[in-house]
Every structure is written in C-alpha cells, then in structure tokens.
Amino acid sequence: MEGPFQLVESVIDTVVTRATPAVFLIRRIEETEKYAYYKGRLGRAPHGTLRQNLKRWLSSDYRVFCFEYVQGENAVFDRQCMLWHNLGGPAGKLDNEQHPEPNEGQTTKCPVCFSNNSRHNP
C-alpha cells in the first residue's frame, strides 16, 4: 500500500492520481496509559471513487490514510478481505465490525475464508 499520508483534502488531491479501483485504510491513534497504537478502517473504492471515498472521512477522527490501486472489482474485494484478515478484523486493529461483503452482483468469495473452509471440509 502507498502511504501513510495525512488525511486532508489537498493531500488526497495530490496523491490520488488514477481513476481505477482501489482499497484504502484510514487510521486514527488510540491511546492507553502505556502506549499508543493505530486503529483503522478498511474500505474499497470502485472505479474512479477513491478521492470521494477518502474525503467523506475528512471530519472524522481518522488522521492518515494508505491506499492501493487494484485491477478489477473482484481483485478489490479479494485484497480488502486479505487485509481485513491480516489486520485481525474488529478484534485486531480495525474498526470494521463486519467482514467485507462482495458488491451486489459479484459472486466472488473471500479468498481467506474460502481457503480455510476448503481445508476443513474436503
């Protein structure tokens, strides 16, 4: 992923240069008495909507973003799922409560869940 970048309009307009599908991660800092850590939210942006998707979070408590251009809508969903699992979902480093779902009309399945189910259900 590219970034992290400051989540401000001028930076978004500068670094988001392509109108292709993408996945993104926005982050905020959580603090405890002993340490601070990033907590984030994953999202996906269909063809040409990354700027708009990021800008809707400008007034939130998220402060930085990373993104990755991905070729094709199924690949966007696959990448978002992989990141969701790698970051531990809501029990880990994400605010996303729910596992990513494919867009309406997509028949793709999560590559991680599908792989795990295949191993346990021959």
Language-model-derived ranges and their functions:
Residues 1-36, 42-122:
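Boundary/linker segments flanking structured domains
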